[in-house]
Amino acid sequence: KTDRMLTLAEQWRLPLVFYAEGGGGRPGDTDRLGMTGLDGPSFVQFARLSGHVPVVGVVSGYCFAGNAAMLGCCDVIIATENASIGMGGPAMIEGGGLGVYHPAEVGPVSFQSPNGVVDILVKDEEEATTVAQKYLSYFQGPIADWKAPDQRLLRRAIPENRLRVYDIRSVIELIADEDSVLEIRRDFGVGMITAFIRIEGKPFGLIANNPKHLGGAIDAPAGDKAARFLQLCDAFDIPIVSLCDTPGFMVGPEAEKTAIVRHVARMFVTGASLTVPLFGIVLRKGYGLGAQSMLGGGFHA
């Protein structure tokens, strides 16, 4: 039944919403020849949807093993506060001699959100469904009914004193249409803001440096976060707005321990292959390679 639904989603290019609760495959079902021969088509079919149609994962409760593997293939994961996500449930963990844990202890959102697994954290399943609907709306083109905030407020959005920090999210709210901002991975890579917005009814992806974190410097999590979001926008032909305010990539021994070279370089690799327009706005500063990475690899139009 699942395989047929995935096949139809691919053939008809239908968005997929996956409610992922569950403990994985049941021994009586997964011990048949196909699975023991490592020929379970569901995972390949699910992963093949990536970049082909929007795929949203929703978790409200426990999600382990095979369910979690499919969840990880989703473009965006929405989880409730009581969710627990893990590649193995309590029985598997105990069977492997790794200890005894309650399901809620395996992968709570208290660390699955800051580590980037969960994209959007919500209160309950009802809110999760509402957010999923809002997310999918950005892939359906412009809307006619929109309202812009008072654009005169932008004149005072950035302090004249360059030593004063400001709230980049407030700036984003002024640029975007009212009630059109949907931030992705808010708790992960806090030095970079990634969000879907609308401007005059048209959908855009947005990346922005956060001056409240390292003065806007791009660290490893921020680079990884931006690159993945740029890929998502490019896959579905959503143009990008980049708000640049960075002194560059983070440097120093502590930064190098995080494999920053690999992570931030992904922004150049992704930027070089972008097929959608990228509109760059330098809010205060844009120095070095970090600034170039915010503009798809360079300032050349």
Locations of regions flagged by a protein language model:
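Ligand-binding clefts of soluble mixed alpha/beta catalytic domains
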Residues: 1-301
